[in-house]
Amino acid sequence: MLKRIATLILTILFTQIIIAQDIVIVGQVLSAESSEPLQAASVWFKGTNLGCTTNEEGFFLLRSNTPQRTLIVSVIGYQQRQIKLDYGKDQMIRIYLKEDISILDEVIAMPKQDEAILLLKNAYKNRHSNNPENVVNISTTMNNLTAINLTNIQQKALQRKLFKDLMSGAIEQTDTTFSLPVYLNQSIYNLQINSDSTLKLLNNSKLNALNIFPAEHWQQIIAAYTPDINPYKTYSTILGHNFMSPIAPNAKLYYNLYLADSTTINGRKNFQIRFSPKHNQGLLFKGHLWIDAETYAITQSDISIPSHTSVNYLNNLHYSFTTESFGNSIFPNNEKQGIGLNINLYPSKNMQYFGALLSEERSYSNTTSTTDTLSIRIKESNIEIPIDDKLEATWNKIDSLNQTRIQQFSAWLVDIILNQYLHIWKVDVGPVLNLFHFNQLEGASPRLTIRSGESFSPNFTVGGYYGYGFKDQYYNNTLISNGLHSYGGNIQWRFGPTRRNILSITYDHKTERVGHDDSDIYAESRVNDIEHIGNAWVMLYRPVSVHMRGRIAAQYQYEKPGFKFKINAFTQNIYANRFIPLIHKGAEVPYYSHIGLRTDFRLSWQQSSLDYFFHRIYLASKYPVVHLTAEGGYIKIPASSANEPYHSLFGKFGIYAQQHTALGFGKIHWMLQANAVVGNAPFPALVMARTSRTSYRHDTDFMLLGSMELMSNYYAALTLRYQTRGYIFGYIPYVKKFGIREDLIFNIGYGYLSDKYTTDNILALPANLYNINQGWNKTPYIECGFGFSNIFKLGDIAFVWRLTHRNSTNPEAQNFAVKWRIGIDF
């Protein structure tokens, strides 16, 4: 979700920023001898400071808002050239440079590749002992500087009336474009790293950011999406993608590797290994490493990505570090990384897009060994290390931007998108998507929902809703009401030092989809009901099974990083309707009563979340998220003219796990679910396979099953999607630049329905349930398919076939379908 938010913020702020109509010079610099492109050549207009460097393919682009006469091109090893320009005209030129014979004798000859491979093998073999992440018994001072800037903003765009007030916070660059500082944080820590723990004490800090998010949310988002680059690891994860290290066991299959140089670093001999990708399809680095000749530790690095790297919105990346030795250990003394993003839904090298630059620098000082880890502890110093005064101007620029109208509008709009509430004085109206409902039972149903806002009380809220469905209600073919009323209320209170505890009391009288009581597990960050205005068109396309319920619930919730616990006690009545009748021993009953207690344990690893007003948004994690649920229930079916009241007990248990992570050069998305219902439960409490209601798909749903087609009291399911890096489209000329990826899809579900549920001794199964003959008990349901994702970086399409139970009589069942989805991904 934060991927969508980040793109949204940039778009909101600068939707109308376009390329200025300046004088533009586009060209390519080549070697006169070999016609190969020359990278990193300096190109500038004579007599000005307007310049740039060529990219990996030798291309450059220069702009000037005044006409220029002469262009100068220079690169080490070649003779400098001056190019006469057509005064005042845009030009596309090709420039050839001759080698400078006078320095050819200084060029270092590169020995065989085998020597580089041997060094890298030894570096990999010793990776655990040399990895700075594994160094213990040291103390150090870390100075961390992180900045985010919006980049490549044209002057003429800032002169427009809508964006004119942004000039107060703009910073002019050497290429005549402007940047806008978004976030700046300098923090100084005292660290002590022991074998069993790391002590981290904040010495001094200063942070400023656009008020689109609270400061702590900025820090969490940046921490979640900052690249984790470590050449000692086989893969480094960048924006959810795995990039292979040049010291990985199979690196020689993907990299060109050369032993380029040797020198002395920290008094020890080191060898320089240069590396570059062998082909354009993999996620690989280029650059060089310095490796210690004795310990095979990496003492210095300079790493970047090739220009052809196919990761959405990733324009460039650079990472470097240097080290110092103390005793037998090597530890960094400086780390730098920068990641450049741009908004380029359509690939074009000649089109310049605004983007963002995230830069981070960490410097370490006063690093010493500690011998007694039990007695030595960091103590807070009375003398704070000062913050860099040179950054004061940037902090002031951010303050200026926070006063602009466009920033204030952007903050308001982002808040509505994330939390879906309109703040009116001390009252919140929303969620916005809940203001209108539509389903086959209610028909069109406008709804008013309000609550007390955070400005009324930061730790308490009370609210309610009322809705009216315009569809007449019938029971046994008799009109019982004109329309259907929905209403309810909620009281919530959060308490404790960190507000991790929440108590709530809720009353609901509303329609709900049958069999989707686990929706809060699969859509944890959602604030709206499952039947809302955004899904209204779905009901027009394909009706789903819903029933009315009246429910009173009391819930306690506790949450801390990595762990969440909920316990919910409730009593409810589930009402029959003309679509889903309730039949007990041959007689229809108007409702049944259900008293229950449900617990949910949520486990996660290295996952952050944004804590809003009684709403939490979970950020992406490469590790699984697991839910363990248990429920005990008592039901009562009222007496009818033919039957006495019926009472029973049942238990329901579940495990849910899902993960979205990089695997090799691709990505894998999987969901595992297993449930068991014991005792005697009414059919709405059984387990129903999640189904896709329309041609729009979700990774956690079966795509071809009909509503309530697979219902059981013992159930297991696995949905799996693997996304490649473009093994087919990545090799097709002209098409590969669009970054289309291939998807492989496999979904399997098995449900066992016990004999006792095939009769009406509890409640008769509805007629549209097609497992009533227990046909699913012997054969699992399987569907598979393939698809294409990252289409225009906005969505994907999938072709899916049903492999088993192809003769289903469910009118909603499909043996083949084309599914689609819209989503922003890196």
Regions found by a protein language model. Name each.
Residues 23-25, 32-47, 66:
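Short, ordered, surface-exposed loop/turn motifs in non-cytosolic proteins
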Residues 25-31, 58, 95:
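A short, amphipathic beta-strand motif
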Residues 45-46, 72-83:
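A short, solvent-exposed loop/turn motif at the edges and junctions
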